[in-house]
Amino acid sequence: MKKHNFNAGPSILPREVIEKTAQAVLDFNGSGLSIMEISHRAKDFQPVVDEAVALFKELLNIPEGYSVLFLGGGASLEFCMIPFNFLEKKAAYLNTGVWAKKAMKEAKAFGEVVEVASSAEATYTYIPKDYTVPADADYFHVTTNNTIYGTELHEDLDSPVPMIADMSSDIFSRPIDVSKYICIYGGAQKNLAPAGVTFVIVKNDAVGKVSRYIPTMLNYQTHIDGGSMFNTPPVLPIYAALQTLRWIKANGGVAEMQKRAKEKADMLYAEIDRNKMFRGTVTDKADRSYMNICFVMNDEYKDLEADFLKFATEKGMVGIKGHRSVGGFRASCYNAMPKESVQALIDCMQEFEKLH
């Protein structure tokens, strides 16, 4: 039976990315060695990093003066590195979910943190829009897609100060005006690669402005100067990321990824809105995520939640259980998710509806 992988992360990767990475695990570039056992300074590996950086810049139209870094530690480490490197006195944060809240918590150790707005009172079921960013803030931090709650910023915001964004779960799913940001970062295990590598796009001249001492490994300048090679980088995930970047380019680039994402999301949201048994959880439909589609049983069918989960699992659906903090269901439809799998979930929902 075909499995349909709706996991929120680590998550689905294009089949050809898995196959090419698997081949490299057995024999990298005809070297007779696995990519897991070569030196990161081997002559065959530097071109992997160089091409991955070049494709990042090409696909996202990154302006001159920015570096692309491949680091470790996940977005969770970036929550600390961001204020360490950029917060001198005051930073502004938009609180749209657990991950934004965690980022804010880390920033408070380095300076004043202004929460410009929050949707916590509504369990983060919408993205606040009525707020003012302080003009004297060092930066304005946003989380562009909220995997737990299914909300997403579909366009870059305007800000009177430089912006920083956690784009862990929607990178390469839409065009970005990178010039609005001094830093874009994320864990790669949702839309780019297997777990283990963190991507950072950083504006070079924004680094080195704070007065505090920054430990070597937490200083972006270290990694800019070292070309992501100051210490041993996550070799295998970087290689897989390169294969994904090639796949995105071969499949029409970021604009095509956005088109496909909207088509898949529209299909599933239409069924959620039509089906008598389900309802969406996001209160403002304009905020509905294309990446993580969250829904619950309507109240009169609430006692059938476990039955639907079992039914869907038997039909090959994987990873549709909602996050433990909110319950319900979540279908993560990242770039690699085929439309056929979304249709399979819709068919499953319709079949379950007919049974009840």
Curated annotation (Swiss-Prot):
GO terms for cellular component: cytoplasm. Its EC number is 2.6.1.52. Pyridoxal 5'-phosphate binds at residues 75-76, 99, 147, 166, 189, 231-232. Binds 1 pyridoxal phosphate per subunit. HAMAP family: SerC_aminotrans_5 (MF_00160). It catalyses: O-phospho-L-serine + 2-oxoglutarate = 3-phosphooxypyruvate + L-glutamate; 4-(phosphooxy)-L-threonine + 2-oxoglutarate = (R)-3-hydroxy-2-oxo-4-phosphooxybutanoate + L-glutamate. This is Phosphoserine aminotransferase. Homodimer. Its cofactor is pyridoxal 5'-phosphate. The modification N6-(pyridoxal phosphate)lysine is found at residue 190. It is found in: Cytoplasm. NCBIfam families: PRK05355.1, serC_1. L-glutamate binds at residue 41. It is an enzyme of class 2 (transferase). Belongs to the class-V pyridoxal-phosphate-dependent aminotransferase family. SerC subfamily. GO terms for molecular function: O-phospho-L-serine:2-oxoglutarate aminotransferase activity; pyridoxal phosphate binding. GO terms for biological process: L-serine biosynthetic process; pyridoxine biosynthetic process.
